[in-house]
Amino acid sequence: MFWESELNAPLLWCLVETESCSTPRTRLPTTALGSCGERTAVQEPDWASVTLGVFVCQACSLLHRGIPHISRVKSVQQETWDASEVELMAAMGNEPAKAKYEQKVPAFYYRPKHTDCKLLREQWIRARYERNEFEFIEKQEPYSAGYREGFLWKRGRDNGQFLSRKFILSEREGALKYFNKQDARDPKAVMKIETLNATFQPAKIGNPYGLQITYLRDNSTRNIFVYHSDSKEMVDWFNAIRAARFHYLQVAFPGASDEELVPKLTRSFMKEGFMEKTGPKHTEGFKKRWFTMDDRRLMYFKDPLDAYARGEVFIGSKENSYTVLPGLPTSTQGYHWNHGITIVTPDRKFLFACETEAEQRDWIAAFQRVINRPMRPQEYAVEAHFKHKP
């Protein structure tokens, strides 16, 4: 992933002559944006691909080293350069490289940020420079065809074992389905594209290619955890889901622009982690639970990899009497962690406790972001039909 100057002015080159080499240097704006989304306050990036002619950030330089037949990385300041390498950097540069290697990126294709998992960042690099997927549209067929079929390792709902399962994604049927047996005629589950979401969770699943798929079943969230041994296959599945969502939303919202639809294709969870909770009477003992904040849905699980939440709480806006407060009511007892949070809703209060003050701050900030955001019309319908499991 390369540095992209946001200025229209050409890059300023100077050659620093030493006894054995010429070293290229470039002056960028004080905050430069890389294609991985990273901003930095340094003016002189330290790494470059001398075969592609682009500057790369340090994290992405490590990924470029994984494709040495395509990209050879050098330090700008600490390694020797020959004249041909300097000439290539001067002739190419980041903007021309972007115009060449990203000329036909589909609107739905996920462009990773520097905070995304290694899998997404690596496959983004390989898709551009190794497979040239965005120069030749026919190479995008695995995730652009509207239909995808294959096998993924799926975690069992009850036994926790990963078993090979057949998956079919069909835009025509508006669903992602999976089958317990290879020759089964009826699917075990049908996940409507309308409520489908996918997010990579390598640490949580315990696999570098682990993907968490969620969908609504009877207005409750169902989790499915899958992976594939091939990294490209897994990212192709992810982008195929995004393509299906994109085309569904284009029909559902015909007047919306691509820029409006793309943020709605898939989403990462706002916050996850363990907290303690008590029951609706506030006299029950506090129990440790895994919490997931998925937009306005706060879900809690006994185990992070549970298929279903033990309960779900809708978090509305401050205009609708939702509030987050630090601490717990003075009469509260039975908690083990000392950093409390109180969520006030129109119906009741929810009491949580965090292990550390830092976790408390992070959770409060996540709740506050949602509460400060006005509710959209469709969210009122979600609130009205929301099911809370006590």
Predicted regions and their residues:
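Cys/His-rich Zn2+-binding "zinc-finger" mini-domains, especially FYVE domains
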Residues: 1-78
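Cys/His-rich, Zn2+-coordinating zinc-finger modules
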Residues: 2-3, 7-8, 58-142
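Polybasic phosphoinositide-binding surfaces of eukaryotic membrane-targeting domains
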Residues: 147-191, 237, 267-316, 350, ...
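Conserved beta-strand elements of beta-rich interaction domains across eukaryotes
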Residues: 26-29, 42-45, 54-55, 61-62, ...
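Eukaryotic intrinsically disordered and solvent-exposed regulatory patches
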Residues: 5-9, 26-32, 41-45, 85, ...
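Disordered regulatory linkers adjacent to lipid/PI-binding modules
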Residues: 145-147, 246-308, 314-315, 319-338, ...
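Cys/His-rich zinc-coordinating "finger" modules and their low-complexity flanking regions
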Residues: 1-18, 122, 126, 145, ...
